[in-house]
C-alpha cells in the first residue's frame, strides 16, 4: 500500500543527482549519464503538492537524441517503488540472482553489470510514483488527487509530459514498461492520453513484464 509520509510545502526541497558510468554490452563499452531527480507537481496556487521521482539513464555518446527511444518503467502494487525493475531488470547494474546453488531467495546479493540492459538501444527512465520509494506526497490534503486508478495514471502523464519537454524528447518513440499493476497503470495512462486530443496524443507503446 502507499506510504503517506508528508512534508510541509514550505520545507520540501527538490533533489537532483547526476553521475556518469560505463557498461560493456555485447563486447562494446557504452558510456552513460544518470540523472536522478524529483519531478514536482504543483497545485493551482503554485505550491508543491507531490513529487514523482525518476532515475534516468542516458547513453552519452549519442549526438542526436531527438529520435532515440525512451523506456519509462515502474513496478506495480499499487504502492511499489521501481526498485525491482530497477535493480533486477532494467538498470545498468543489477542484482546477481541466477546463482543455482544459492541457499536463500533473500539478500544480500552481489551487484553486477546488467548484461540485458537496454541502454545500448534506448534511454531508460525508472519511476517512483507518488507515495512510493522517493516519490512523496507533500500535501496530505491532496491524497485523493493521487491515490486512485485514474489519479495515479494522470499524475504519471503529467510528469512524463514535463520530462519529455525538459529533455527535448518529443519525437522519441516512448514505451511504458509496467510490471504487474504497472501494466494497468500503463493502459490507463495510454487511454487518457489517447482521448485528450492533440495536446496529449504523443504516441505511447506498452510493454508488460
Protein language model annotation of sequence segments:
Residues 208-209:
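Conserved small/polar residues in nucleotide/adenosyl-binding loops
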Amino acid at each position: 500500500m502507499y506510504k503517506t509520509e508528508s512534508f510541509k510545502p514550505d520545507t520540501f526541497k527538490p533533489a537532483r543527482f547526476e553521475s556518469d558510468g560505463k557498461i560493456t554490452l555485447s563486447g562494446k563499452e557504452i558510456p552513460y549519464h544518470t540523472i536522478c531527480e524529483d519531478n514536482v507537481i504543483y497545485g493551482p496556487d503554485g505550491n508543491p503538492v507531490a513529487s514523482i521521482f525518476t532515475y534516468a539513464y542516458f547513453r552519452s555518446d549519442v549526438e542526436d537524441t531527438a529520435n532515440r527511444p525512451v523506456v519509462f518503467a515502474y513496478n506495480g502494487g499499487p504502492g511499489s517503488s521501481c526498485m525491482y525493475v530497477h535493480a533486477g531488470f532494467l538498470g545498468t547494474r543489477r542484482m546477481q540472482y541466477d546463482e543455482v546453488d544459492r541457499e536463500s531467495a533473500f539478500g544480500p546479493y552481489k551487484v553486477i553489470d546488467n548484461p540485458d540492459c537496454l541502454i545500448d538501444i534506448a534511454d531508460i527512465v525508472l519511476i517512483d510514483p507518488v507515495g512510493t520509494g522517493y516519490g512523496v506526497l507533500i500535501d496530505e490534503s491532496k491524497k485523493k488527487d493521487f491515490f486512485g486508478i485514474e489519479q495515479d495514471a494522470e499524475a504519471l502523464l503529467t510528469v512524463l509530459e514535463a520530462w519529455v519537454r525538459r529533455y527535448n524528447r518529443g519525437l522519441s518513440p516512448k514505451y511504458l514498461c509496467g510490471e504487474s499493476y504497472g501494466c494497468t497503470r500503463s493502459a490507463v495512462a495510454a487511454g487518457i492520453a489517447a482521448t485528450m486530443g492533440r495536446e496529449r496524443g504523443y504516441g505511447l507503446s506498452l510493454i508488460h513484464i
